[in-house]
């Protein structure tokens, strides 16, 4: 999640129609954790790499990147920084000169131990709403959402949430490959299909995202011919959004992918695991989300912000 993505989330409400989905709850918890971050994404990736190398040398930089869910280009930059600080050693693989063997140095072990304490303290703070037993259970359930080969490499609740969130998002989007759609399109399309016409501001409130974020989202749907943006006949200062016939057709495609993803998640978590994880994630969100979003986004509300569509800034929702 980038900085522009994280500011798309609005603490305070949760859309009831989306809270059944583990992937959605993970996204909100990940956004909540990211919003209170002390460091940067690069700090998180560096810790993951150091922790992975603590148990063994790694014979393929590319393989480690894939196991940790880190883009290969970003992985090169992470290793460059760690190597420059003397925390990681990168040497040619004698069995394959095209690959590098990654090793943790003594300095790297010291840096890892120092970070472990900080990570543990941060996890305690982020999961303060849970008992120690609940947090242990949360970590175990989150690990089930990761590939078996990755599970031993990712430690700490914050990192498990991030990895599970990214994996489910990719898994869902892979189901829509070739359609031009993303799992994130389900929320706005399903809301607009139910409540139409709908003002742009009301859609933002219903989805609990910022105005700039919903503008970017709607722009994307309008460009694809899935949503029509017109003026509200009752208030010319506002936009009235409607799903097109093509949008309804594509909503069916996205809905099937979302259902398939939910079934996959249920299988990964095992009997009772889905309800248990949903409850634990809900507890983490309870402190910052006071209640459900409005059930009808079509209710009229004043909106000065929508009167100047050209002033929007881009803030993608993932």
What is each PLM-predicted segment?
Residues 1-40, 128, 132-179, 303-307, ...:
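N-terminal leader segment of winged-helix/HTH proteins
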Residues 24, 28, 32, 54-55, ...:
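Alpha-helical structural segments
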Residues 24-27, 31-74, 79, 85, ...:
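N-terminal helix-turn-helix DNA-binding core of bacterial DNA-binding proteins
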Residues 74, 99, 213:
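Residues in the helix-turn-helix
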Residues 81-136, 217-279:
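Charged, amphipathic alpha-helical coiled-coil/dimerization segments
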Residues 183, 205, 210-212, 216, ...:
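Intrinsic, low-complexity N-terminal interaction/targeting segments
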Residues 290, 295-303, 310:
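Ser/Thr/Pro-rich low-complexity tandem-repeat tracts
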């Amino acid at each position: 999640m980038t900085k522009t993505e994280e500011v798309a989330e609005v603490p305070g409400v949760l859309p009831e129609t989306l809270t059944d989905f583990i992937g959605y709850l993970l996204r909100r918890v990940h956004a909540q954790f990211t919003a209170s971050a002390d460091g940067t994404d690069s700090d998180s990736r560096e810790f993951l790499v150091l922790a992975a190398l603590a148990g063994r040398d790694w014979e393929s930089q590319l393989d480690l990147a894939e196991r940790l869910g880190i883009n290969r280009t970003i992985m090169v930059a992470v290793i460059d920084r760690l190597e420059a600080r003397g925390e990681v050693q990168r040497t040619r693989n004698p069995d394959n000169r095209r690959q590098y063997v990654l090793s943790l140095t003594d300095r790297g072990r010291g840096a890892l131990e120092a970070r472990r304490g900080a990570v543990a303290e941060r996890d305690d703070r982020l999961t303060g709403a849970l008992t120690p037993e609940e947090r242990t259970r949360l970590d175990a359930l989150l690990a089930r959402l990761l590939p078996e080969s990755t599970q031993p490499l990712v430690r700490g609740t914050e990192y498990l949430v991030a990895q599970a969130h990214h994996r489910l998002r990719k898994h869902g989007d892979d189901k829509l490959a070739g359609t031009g759609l993303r799992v994130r399109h389900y929320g706005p399309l399903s809301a607009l299909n139910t409540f139409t016409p709908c003002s742009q501001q009301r859609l933002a409130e219903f989805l609990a995202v910022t105005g700039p974020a919903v503008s970017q989202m709607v722009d994307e749907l309008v460009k694809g011919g899935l949503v029509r943006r017109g003026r509200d006949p009752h208030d010319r200062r506002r936009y009235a959004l409607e799903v097109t016939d093509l949008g309804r057709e594509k909503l069916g495609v996205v809905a099937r992918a979302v259902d398939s993803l939910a079934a996959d998640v249920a299988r990964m978590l095992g009997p009772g695991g889905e309800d248990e994880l949903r409850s634990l994630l809900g507890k983490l969100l309870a402190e910052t989300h006071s209640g459900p979003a409005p059930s009808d986004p079509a209710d009229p509300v004043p909106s000065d912000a929508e009167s100047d569509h050209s002033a929007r800034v881009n803030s993608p929702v993932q």
